[in-house]
């Protein structure tokens, strides 16, 4: 940057590595030049709303692009601004630094400006929710436009528009307004600090939308990879926004590959077929839709096994999707995480999660097609309310997705590891006593090693 540029902008630029700074500094001229070449009309010295729309139009709605423009305009660059000149070079650089490399304290004023306006000091949860709907929609569109779908096919998946609204409402529900419905800067700072997904959405939209490519930091990963799904024949309940919501909650996060194991739409309504598809297949996500449109499910952290005892561990959870998106983790009250039984006369036969016999948080009867969610006032295991529209529900659709590696793959990975890798203290002691580590450096590298 030149000597005449603001001290504030120069400090922000220092956050980027030397090899990244040309990409950041060149963004202004590139955006300005794109508009100049696309139109023979007179252009301002700064960036205009039209310039942003030309660049981001395929990844964000018109209202979201206006919000970004408001955020840019809200920045004090530390140098005089000329009214009518548009967004200055310094404002853009500070904006990029705060979104791509900033803290919750620096991002909070930008979120406030994008939700309420450049001069705002406070906003409402309703305004934040509207902003979030625009932002989540933009994230989904950006993933599709930039080819970051990781083998998912949105056109064969659940209602994406509904999912955007549900995820936006869920994220907004995490706000802790100081007043009944009022959010100030401190409230937004706390929210951004607690909800890392917010920063990822912003980073994805601004980095990809404005074409800022940073070698040291690829675009945020918001989706897990889809390892297998019969897309030609499939129309699933799972949606991209639901994947964005669920995958960070899993033990392996976004790295866990998903594969379809069972769907009533493809495999029919058969409890025996369900067992055959899911037993001993590793961790799974169950997704249930009842005949009244409610969508809910659960995550099982271990393979399903047929036995009269409860199974699983505290990593299991229940969740709701529609009419609201929420997660319900274990309370510690009991260990009734998972249950699967068949062919017993004295024990319940079916699949359940949480609660107790006859009063599960989620229950699918072996006589396929119906179940219950008897959790009034709350499920003892997960603290979840009634998940279905009615306590006893009829099943419309059931999907089961395997998440993570298969048990045999996990076992094979563990066998590959040297005992010295598993116990670094033993390795250190051998080196201290002069023992030669003959196998060191001789094993074939792992597939995922550089």
Swiss-Prot record:
Q: Which UniProt keywords apply?
A: Cytoplasm, Lysosome, Membrane
Its taxonomic path starts at: Eukaryota, Metazoa, Chordata, Craniata, Vertebrata
Q: Which GO terms describe its biological process?
A: positive regulation of protein localization to lysosome; regulation of cell migration; regulation of cell population proliferation; response to amino acid; response to insulin; response to nutrient levels; response to oxidative stress; TOR signaling
One of the Pfam families matching this protein, by short name: TLD
- SMART domains in the record: TLDc
Q: Where is this region: Disordered?
A: 430-450
What are the disulphide bonds in this sequence? Answer: none
Q: What does this protein do?
A: Activates an alternative mTOR signaling to regulate cell proliferation and migration.
**Where, subcellularly, is it found?**
Membrane; Cytoplasm; Lysosome
Under PROSITE patterns, the record lists: TLDC (PS51886)
Question: Does Cytoplasm show up as a keyword for this record?
Answer: yes
The name under which this protein is listed is: MTOR-associated protein MEAK7
Q: Name one GO cellular component term.
A: membrane
InterPro entries in the cross-refs: TLDc_dom (IPR006571)
In what residue span(s) does the TLDc domain sit?
236-404
């Amino acid at each position: 940057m030149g000597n005449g540029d603001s001290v504030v902008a120069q400090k922000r630029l220092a956050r980027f590595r030397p090899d990244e700074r040309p990409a950041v500094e060149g963004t202004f001229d590139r955006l300005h030049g794109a508009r100049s070449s696309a139109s023979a009309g007179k252009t301002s010295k700064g960036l205009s709303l039209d310039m942003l729309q030309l660049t981001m139009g395929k990844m964000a709605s018109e209202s979201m692009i206006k919000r970004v423009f408001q955020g840019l305009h809200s920045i004090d660059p530390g140098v005089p601004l000329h009214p009518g000149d548009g967004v200055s070079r310094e404002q853009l650089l500070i904006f990029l630094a705060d979104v791509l490399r900033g803290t919750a304290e620096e991002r909070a004023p930008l979120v406030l400006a994008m939700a309420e306006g450049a001069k705002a000091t406070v906003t409402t949860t309703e305004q934040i929710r509207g902003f979030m709907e625009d932002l989540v929609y933009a994230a989904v569109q950006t993933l599709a436009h930039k080819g970051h779908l990781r083998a998912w096919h949105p056109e064969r998946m659940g209602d994406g528009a509904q999912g955007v609204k549900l995820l936006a409402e869920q994220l907004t529900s995490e706000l802790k307004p100081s007043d009944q419905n009022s959010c100030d800067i401190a409230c937004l700072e706390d929210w951004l600090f607690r909800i890392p997904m917010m920063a990822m959405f912003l980073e994805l939209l601004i980095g990809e939308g404005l074409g800022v490519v940073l070698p040291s930091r690829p675009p945020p990963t918001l989706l897990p990879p889809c390892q297998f799904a019969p897309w030609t024949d499939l129309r699933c309940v799972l949606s991209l926004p639901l994947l964005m919501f669920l995958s960070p909650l899993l033990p392996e996060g976004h790295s866990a590959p998903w594969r379809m194991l069972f769907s009533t739409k493809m495999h029919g309504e058969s409890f025996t077929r369900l067992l055959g598809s899911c037993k001993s297949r590793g961790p799974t996500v169950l997704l249930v839709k009842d005949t009244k449109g409610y969508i809910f499910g659960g995550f099982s952290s271990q393979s399903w096994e047929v036995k009269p005892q409860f199974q699983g561990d505290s990593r299991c959870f229940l969740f709701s999707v529609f009419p609201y998106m929420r997660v319900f983790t274990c309370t510690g009250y009991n260990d009734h995480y998972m249950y699967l039984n068949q062919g017993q006369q004295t024990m319940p036969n079916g699949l359940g999660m949480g609660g107790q016999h006859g009063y599960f948080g989620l229950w699918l009867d072996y006589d396929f097609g119906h179940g219950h969610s008897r959790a009034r006032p709350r499920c003892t295991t997960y603290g979840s309310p009634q998940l279905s529209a009615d306590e006893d529900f009829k099943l419309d659709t059931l999907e089961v997705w395997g998440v993570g590696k298969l048990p045999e793959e996990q076992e094979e990975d563990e066998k590959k590891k040297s005992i010295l890798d598993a116990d670094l203290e033993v390795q250190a002691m051998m080196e201290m006593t002069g023992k030669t580590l003959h196998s060191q450096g001789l094993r074939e590298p792992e597939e995922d090693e550089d």
